[in-house]
């Protein structure tokens, strides 16, 4: 089994996944940008960590939401390359969140090649957060995301951890929990 870790963070829209990941950018620097085909991300040498996705200040929809809809094959190739080179180089850990890569296919690929840890964020403030950010995600889309998360939970069969993300204190605790995987 691989010694490098891949941390996947999922949850319904507006639970605070992107806000949680932004804590890494606020607390560590520098971050170098990288690109592998259609897969973009940020690398921090001190944490030995790659965060997948595109994060820009002030964007509501950042992270893997900013990647191409056709990024999945490049993600899978990237995971294979990471596994292949692990024997020769001290490789990096990988962290991602969001709908684009948080799917069964990506999770299955990750768990066959790396030490996978899955966190699911939940919040009782999802409805008010949708209003606060003025998003226009349809009820059909939101129900589809709920179904997707439920299917992933069923597949993982309790091999995930739920993180409540209702307050600033929760955000800090969740950040420290995820950070502890890398330090």
Model-derived features with residue positions:
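Conserved phosphate-donor/acceptor-positioning beta-strand/loop module used by diverse small-molecule
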Residues: 97-98, 110-131
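Switch I (effector-binding) loop of TRAFAC-class P-loop GTPase G-domains
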Residues: 29-45
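Hydrophobic anchor at the beta1->P-loop junction of P-loop NTPases
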Residues: 9
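P-loop (Walker A) phosphate-binding loop of NTP-binding proteins
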Residues: 12
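A conserved segment at the C-terminal end of the G1
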Residues: 18-31
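ATP-binding Walker
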Residues: 15
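NTP-dependent small-molecule kinase module
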Residues: 153-183
């Amino acid at each position: 089994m691989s010694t490098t870790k891949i941390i996947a963070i999922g949850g319904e829209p507006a639970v605070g996944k992107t806000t949680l990941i932004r804590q890494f950018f606020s607390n560590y620097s520098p971050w170098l940008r990288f690109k592998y085909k259609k897969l973009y991300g940020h690398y921090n040498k001190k944490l030995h960590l790659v965060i997948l996705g595109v994060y820009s200040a002030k964007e509501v929809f950042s992270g893997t939401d900013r990647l191409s809809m056709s990024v999945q094959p490049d993600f899978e190739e990237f995971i294979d390359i990471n596994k292949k080179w692990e024997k020769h180089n001290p490789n990096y850990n990988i962290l991602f969140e969001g709908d684009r890569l948080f799917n069964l296919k990506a999770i299955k690929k990750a768990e066959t090649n790396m030490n996978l840890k899955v966190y699911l964020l939940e919040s009782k403030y999802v409805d008010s957060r949708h209003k606060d950010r003025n998003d226009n995600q349809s009820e059909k889309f939101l129900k589809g995301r709920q179904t997707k998360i439920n299917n992933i939970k069923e597949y993982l069969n309790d091999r995930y951890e739920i993180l409540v993300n209702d307050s600033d204190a929760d955000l800090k605790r969740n950040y420290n929990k995820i950070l502890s995987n890398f330090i």
